[in-house]
Amino acid sequence: MAVFTVNGKTVTAEKNQKLLRFLRDELRLTSVKDGCSEGACGTCTVLIDGKPTKACVPQTDKLEGKNILTVEGLSDWEKKVYTWAFGEAGAVQCGFCIPGMVISAKALLDTNPDPSREEAAFAIRNNICRCTGYVKIIDAILLAAKCFREGKLPEAPVDWKVGSRVHRVDVEEKVTGTGQYPDDVYLDGMLYGSAVRSQYPRARVLAIHTEEAKALPGVVCVLTAADIPGINKVGHLKKDWDTMIAVGDITHYLGDAICLVAAKTPEALAQAKALVKVDYEELPAVHNPQEAILPDAPLVHREGNLLAHKHIQRGNPAEALAKSKYLITRRFSTPWTEHAFLEPECAVACPDGDGVLVLSTDQGAYDTQHEIMGMLGLPAEQVKVRNCLVGGGFGGKEDVTVQHHAALIAYLTKRPVKVKLTRAESLLIHPKRHPMEMEFSLGCDENGIIQGVAAECIADTGAYASLGGPVLERACTHGAGPYQYEAYEIDGWAYYTNNPPAGAFRGFGVTQTCFCIETLLNEMADKVGISPWEIRYRNAIRPGGVLPNGQIVDGSTGLVETLEAVKPYYDEAVKNGDPVGLACAMKNAGVGVGIPDTGRTRLTVRDGKLHIFAGASCIGQGLGTVLTQTVCGETGIPRENVVYERSNTWIAPDSGTTSGSRQTLFTGEACIRACQDLKKALEEHSLADLEGQEFYGEYLGKTDPLGADVPNPVSHIAYGYATQLCVLDKDTGRIKQMVAAHDVGKAVNPLSVEGQIEGGVVMSMGYALTERYPIDENCRPTVKFGTLGLFRANQIPEIKPIIVEKPGLNVGGGAIGIGEITSIPTAPAIAEAYRRYDGELRTELPLKNTPYAKK
């Protein structure tokens, strides 16, 4: 037992436990987030006697007489200052890390009221952010310091039209910790659920012994596949992922659920899981595509080890390469990568009539609903899904991980339940970025004009399909780069293995093939005798040009403008003798390739305010702010009369997944269309007169399938374009500056666009230099959150985001999403900078022999 002070009140911890658990579970101080429980991420940072401390580390028995402060304990003035500063700086995206950042900022400003930028970065070095790239968080700390020194608070922006730099609609709840993520939900009588996972990557389950676990006091149920009333398989495009492995069936990876346990307390849950005994027949595993392709390879799935094969061809690349003045062929290798979103997967489910209600953190509430409907055998009206706040996704929360398990327990026990992954489980279970082995050949004429490209790509898609097929397709369609030439051919294969699944990850396959084509272009520039900038400028796709996939691009194409935007920085680096690398990229907005892709929005007048409903997840990218600005700009309704509602499946229309950089364009266009009808109604009525009325907008983006025999195939509604460059310190070899110019069509909120650029750049700096997700001979990842190699605030260089607004797109207000493209060209730009630094051509990620390389 220990007695100490929390936020000015004396409290008693009767039993010894981690401070984090005491603050959250007993005091309900949910601003203190559980991001890892390993002392690594900083989301649980509190002040103990004025010192920032991770609450997941100390035990309560060691805190006798201590004074503890959480964000809830800040003064009203401090809360107002930090809310304004983080809003003004654009420092909030998913928000999961923000309360911990605020506490670290307070610790700094209490002792140093006028810190330098370097001091602010150092103060938050133990707080990881995966969204923002830290730049705007540091800006926010300096703004807060200025407010505290001057004792006054500036007004927030009042102009909410499209193009304004506004504070995001969710700033206050994320800064003060009042917004709810699923793990912040506590319900009366709530159970705690978790899965017993496979001990082997590939083994036949012979028997599951649950008797001892069921007999343990506090245990409510132990469920197996036999208890599932509907279908045991889930999966986005291919139903191959087992909800639980049935007796007699074979496991596919170590993350497979064997059974589900639900208990009244977390302690009873842990004890019960340990009492479940499973009999296995261990079987040989498939460790990589090279093994998967062998004629006598074990089958990961009955139908074979090949998930997908993609072949794309335009023109005759073999002939074009044979006639090329210069030809380069190289092999490339890119690794597994972990999303490392700060919020581990969590869902709360409870009975709802004859069905269930699920509070979820995901990238598509309707996708989650459909998976649960199939598993439970229920119609849509009996399965409701509502998004809480989502603590980051980056593609890693497109597949269900805990939602269906929570729904099953709640449905069968008629009790509310929380199912949450530990950080170790999260690292194992959700799909990662595909590792790929690639070979690219590039041919150019004497002027550096691309004549043709031929390529092959082999991807490890892991244990389940997830989105491996579309990822492979996108890697192939975009492997040609954003350049105009006619001869292109690529073959891609994705193979099942018994490794963790691979699926969607920011960049969606393009990150891998971009590394290849851009590295070859940099090498080719030397052969031709021109600069890497010049070879891109000569080949850049321009309005009216034809991409290697056959699509004629429209007037909104802004690649040349991004090249021109970085030219002064490139020339300055060359003049100063600083090693500099350059790379370009393009990325589609929307699903495309002939697949129906629809955005939908419903505007409802309630209590004199306009409520925005869109069934699209806001995972940190700022969709709620985009739609709010759209409504304010299109209708003239004041910001204070507009309410953005979180996604759900019973009022908000299905707007598709938050993926493919699609929501700003597709749901944004749907919102514009709904606003047009509302605006007409407002010509004759006040908003109050329209009480109870609804205004609906829908936009279907029509595209052509790959290989469509039409004169101008439209693979995608729109593309974003980018040029990034990396400048090294010529003495230390460390990155001095990253410059990122991105064509976004129209920046709805430039503040958010800059934040997306900065965050994407830092994420792919890690991809290029430091991040690792090693898997051992047992198909088990051997990392913890703290050893992933994520960049910290005091390690980032100057980042210069440049917004290019090329008009011409006639939907979505001209705006093109940039959630993915911001991290695509970063790695090849960095690789080229190091080639200029030491002459070594690097074709494998993470890059070797740099000051950042793991010793």
Language model regions located:
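Phosphate/diphosphate-binding loops
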Residues: 257, 263-265, 414-462, 669-688
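Short beta-strand elements
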Residues: 46, 173, 179, 346-351, ...
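Thiamine diphosphate
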Residues: 393-414, 418-419, 623
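Signature of N-terminal electron-transfer/Fe-S-associated modules in redox systems
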Residues: 1-155, 593
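Helix-loop-helix junctions that connect adjacent transmembrane helices in secondary transporters/permeases
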Residues: 294-376, 540-609, 689-714, 784-792
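Flexible, low-hydrophobicity surface segments
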Residues: 145-307, 327, 412
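C-terminal catalytic domains of large/alpha subunits in multi-subunit enzymes
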Residues: 225-226, 377-382, 412-417, 446, ...
